Regions:
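Juxta-kinase regulatory segment immediately upstream of eukaryotic protein kinase catalytic domains
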Residues: 1-24
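Active-site activation/catalytic loop segments of kinase-like enzymes and analogous catalytic loops
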Residues: 187-197, 259-296, 310-327, 339-347
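ATP-binding pocket architecture of kinase catalytic cores
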Residues: 42-184, 195, 221-222
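Active-site catalytic-loop/activation-segment of kinase and kinase-like phosphoryl-transfer enzymes
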Residues: 172-216
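Short secondary-structure junctions
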Residues: 15-23, 105-107, 295-297
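Active-site acidic catalytic loop and adjacent metal/ATP-binding pocket
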Residues: 34-41, 54-55, 156, 213-264, ...
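ATP/Mg2+ or Mg2+-diphosphate-binding catalytic cores
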Residues: 318-369
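ATP-binding glycine-rich phosphate-binding loop
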Residues: 20-43
Length: 369
C-alpha cells in the first residue's frame, strides 16, 4: 500500500500531468468504501471559466481481488470477498468502462476527463451537489425525482448488454450476479448479525436458511438479463433538471455493475437504507415501471421483487452489522430499524412465508432494531 506522503506526491504529479496542476483542491471525504474524493476548482479569469471537477482517489491493492471471468467457486473463495460477491474491488478501470458505457446509452454518468487506473486516480465531470437525498430533505416534491429514477432504470433495462464494457482504453467484464454471489450476499447476515445482536444460529437453522434461499437465488440468476447499477439509491443519484429524459438522473458509484434481475435496482431505490421511502411512493414507482413494461407478468415480477428485495435488505443488514462491529462505524446502526420495516413488508408476500417463519423462530423481535 502506498504511504500517505507518497500518495500525495503521486496525486500531485497526476494532476500536473493532465493539466490540473493549478487547481484549488477541496476535500469531499469518502464513503463506506476505500475511495475518497476532492473537488478541483479552477480560478475564474480571462482564460478560465471557473469550472470545477471531481478527483477520485482509489488506492490500488487496498481491497481483495475482483472476480476473474470464468473463475471457479473454489478460486473465488481463495481470492476473497470481492471475488465471491463479484464486486469490482474499487478498480478505477471498472469505473471508467462503466461510465463510458452509461454515457453511450444517453444516461448521465460523470464524463472521465483523465484517468490512470494503474495508480487508482481519475478526474471526472462534476455533476454538482443536488443529490436526491439532499433535495428530498429540503421538502422538494419527490415525485418527479422518483419518476425520473424509474425512467433511468427503464432506459438501463432496455439497453443491450455486452459481455465486456470498454471505454478510454479501460475494459471491464459485465459478470452475472450468479448463485454464488447471491449466496454471499445473504450469508453476510448470518455471519455478522450474530456479532451485532448476540444471536446464535445452529446447524438446523443454517440448513433451513440454505433451503429457503436456494430457489430465490435460482430466480435471481435465471432472471439476470439487465445492466444492474447495484447501488441505485438517493445518495448516488443527482438531479439534473436541465437535461432531458433519463439523462436528468446523474449516476454515481456504479463500478460494481453486474448483469442481474431487473428487480434488484428497484429494490435498491425503493428499499433505501438511508431514508424512508413511503409505501405510497414505492407503489407509484412500481406502477410506473410495470406500466412501461407490459410484456412482464405483473404477479410474477412483484413476487420476484419481494423475494430479491428481501435478499437485498438482508444483505444490507449484514453489511451494516459488519461496518458497526468490525469497522467501528456506529452511525450505520441508525439505518438498521428502517431496514427491518422494509423487510416486514416483503414478508407480507405469502410466497415468503417460510422466510418469515425462519426469522420469527431465530431472530426475536428485540433483535430487529
Amino acid at each position: 500500500m502506498i504511504l500517505s506522503s507518497e500518495r500525495e506526491v503521486a496525486k500531485a504529479a497526476f494532476l500536473k500531468t493532465h493539466g490540473f496542476g493549478d487547481v484549488r483542491r477541496e476535500s469531499l471525504g469518502g464513503d463506506a468504501s476505500t475511495r475518497s474524493y476532492e473537488r478541483l476548482h479552477r480560478a475564474k479569469n480571462a482564460d478560465e471559466d471557473g469550472s470545477s471537477f471531481i478527483f477520485m482517489d482509489q488506492p490500488p491493492s487496498v481491497e481483495t481481488a475482483p472476480c476473474p471471468p470464468g473463475a471457479t467457486p473454489e478460486e473465488r473463495a481463495a481470492l476473497g470477498y470481492n471475488a465471491l460477491a463479484r464486486l469490482a474491488a474499487g478498480r478505477v478501470d471498472a469505473f471508467v468502462a462503466c461510465a463510458g458505457w452509461l454515457n453511450a446509452q444517453g444516461l448521465s454518468a460523470p464524463k472521465v476527463l483523465a484517468a490512470n487506473p494503474a495508480i487508482g486516480l481519475a478526474v471526472l465531470e462534476d455533476l454538482g451537489d443536488d443529490l436526491y437525498a439532499r433535495l428530498i430533505e429540503t421538502g422538494i416534491d419527490e415525485a418527479p425525482l422518483y419518476d425520473a429514477a424509474i425512467d433511468g432504470l427503464l432506459a438501463l433495462h432496455a439497453a443491450p448488454t455486452p459481455d465486456v464494457l470498454s471505454f478510454g482504453g479501460s475494459t471491464w467484464p459485465l459478470l452475472t450476479y450468479d448463485d454464488l454471489a447471491l449466496k454471499t450476499a445473504h450469508d453476510i447476515f448470518i455471519e455478522w448479525q450474530p456479532k451485532f445482536r448476540d444471536l446464535t444460529f445452529d446447524e438446523a437453522a443454517l440448513a433451513e436458511w440454505e433451503a429457503i434461499w436456494a430457489p430465490i437465488r435460482n430466480t435471481g440468476e435465471a432472471g439476470a438479463t439487465v445492466f444492474c447499477h447495484r447501488d441505485y439509491h438517493a445518495e448516488n443519484l443527482i438531479w439534473l433538471p436541465e437535461r432531458q429524459g433519463a439523462a436528468r438522473v446523474g449516476l454515481l458509484d456504479f463500478q460494481d455493475a453486474v448483469l442481474a434481475h431487473p428487480a434488484w435496482d428497484l429494490s435498491m431505490l425503493l428499499h433505501d437504507a438511508r431514508r424512508t421511502v413511503s409505501p405510497e411512493r414505492e407503489t407509484a414507482s412500481l406502477e410506473r415501471y410495470l406500466a412501461a413494461r407490459p410484456e412482464l407478468d405483473r404477479t410474477a415480477f412483484l413476487a420476484d421483487y419481494h423475494a430479491l428485495g428481501a435478499l437485498n435488505i438482508i444483505r444490507i443488514l449484514g453489511i451494516f452489522a459488519r461496518l458497526v462491529t468490525r469497522d467501528g462505524k456506529p452511525r450505520y446502526a441508525d439505518f438498521i430499524p428502517r431496514l427491518w420495516v422494509y423487510l416486514e413488508v416483503c414478508f407480507a408476500d405469502p410466497a415468503l412465508a417460510d422466510l418469515k417463519a425462519w426469522f420469527d423462530q431465530y431472530v426475536p423481535a428485540e433483535a430487529r432494531r
